[in-house]
Amino acid sequence: MQATPGQRVRTRFAPSPTGHLHVGGLRTALYNYLYAKSMGGDFIVRIEDTDQARKVEGAERSLLNTLEVTGIVPDESFIHGGNFGPYVQSERLGIYSKYCEQLLEQKQAYYCFSTAEELEANRKLQMKQGMQPKYDRKWLPEEMGGNMPESEIRRKREEGAPFVVRMKVPDYISIMFEDMIRGPIEFDSATVDDQVLMKSDGFPTYHFASIIDDHLMEISHVIRGEEWLSSMPKHILLYEFFGWEPPKVAHLPLLLNPDRSKLSKRQGDVAAEDFISKGYSPEAIINFVALLGWNEGEGCEREVYSLDELKDKFTLRRVGKAGAVFNVEKLGWLEKQYIKARPASEIISAIKPLLQAELAKKETGMDADRLVSDDYLGQVIELMRERVNFEHEFISFSRYFYFDPEEFDEKAVAKRWVDDTNEVLGEFIEVLENTADFSADNIEAALKAFVAPREKKPAFLIHPVRILTSGVGFGPSLYHMLEVLGKETVIRRLRKGIGVVGK
């Protein structure tokens, strides 16, 4: 099921400003964005802040910033503007009050004065009796089929007693709709509660505000998480009460942990901001999230997609019903693919400011101008591409390319040093000093020629030289690493190292 011919596709992402953007929310935003863009339509961000008690100051701007960092830029929002604002629900209270009055006049909603204590007692009683907890309709007026006299309702209102407004769910009807992912779905109205529409603080509930806003903002498709599926009967009824055509709906599969338990907001590291702060690139994050429930087609093994490619290929027909497993190892794998493919010039632009900040704080012992040159950084990048997991590790995991080692891996030293290691190293330093062309090939040839008459294997020197020049016992090709570091730096570090290690 696609858009109705002639109808402009308009989708929306409507987060509550209660904190960071959960990765499930990012997926919802992405799928709405991709569907709208694949259909030549509009993507709207609307802030649903009707729960004022849980609102976090500044969260709405943080949410929007996270979306834009990952490339999900709305066509309309409280910042971008548009013809259907305001885009923050707390700025639309008059609109909701107007439509609430309409339902009261139509006898499809009613005032409820039940206290929190009464509601809780009723809930416990129903559960004890094995019933599904529902409002007991104590305040349903006689004229709407209930037992409460209009005079008692009027008296309570005149006293100024706190109240909520509830919808009156019709009895004994079937509520049916078509889900774009799950197909036809049917609910019995007997399972649907008389939902609160307006709270005692004058704010609407999510259910009431969202259907009004979706209608007034001409939202054509509502794409959201599976957890909202049970709310659809209330929403369908509200559309019928107002005589409005409901938007098409699609409910996305749950996100699951590798053990197939539900991924929860309360778990650590499930906020999109967490992944960004750890160094995952926006491209990898979006690629990863896109695959949480969607694939291009049967038999397609492709897993790396740019945002533009996703906009071209995305369809709700390829979104599954089963829960999607959230495996952060897959995100790590994708990040590696992007690092391998990213042009060196882009990486240089990203890491150079970080390196310059480091060099401003710490003495390097090397030519600082050379270290931040595109030529030098390009050589480091090509040596380290296969070894780093994040872009920032071209600096943090590769510090020996910029700073002399301050300490040496003790385990590596214990494993590689014997009685004559320093003596042989001292002799090899003289060989390096006399190596005119300090290239990887010449360094390798010189080392092998040096150890051969001494009846030692190249590894006898390879490992100590690596440890003294880098501080660690692992890394890229030693000969290429030494070439990049340069003759002066290598000899200085070796001389300094044998004065410290193996004594």
Curated annotation (Swiss-Prot):
Entries under Gene3D superfamilies matching the protein: 1.10.10.350, HUPs
GO molecular function: ATP binding; glutamate-tRNA ligase activity; tRNA binding; zinc ion binding
Cellular localization per UniProt: Cytoplasm
Domain of life: Bacteria
Pfam family, one: Anticodon_2
Keywords per UniProt: Aminoacyl-tRNA synthetase, ATP-binding, Cytoplasm, Ligase, Nucleotide-binding, Protein biosynthesis
Enzyme class, UniProt record, top EC level: ligase
Any one Gene Ontology BP term: glutamyl-tRNA aminoacylation
Predominant subcellular localization, coarse grouping: cytoplasm
Xref: HAMAP family: Glu_tRNA_synth_type1
Similarity comment text for this entry: Belongs to the class-I aminoacyl-tRNA synthetase family. Glutamate--tRNA ligase type 1 subfamily.
Self-association state and partner proteins as the record states: Monomer.
Full protein name: Glutamate--tRNA ligase
Organism: Chlorobium phaeobacteroides (strain BS1)
Lineage: Bacteria, Pseudomonadati, Chlorobiota, Chlorobiia, Chlorobiales
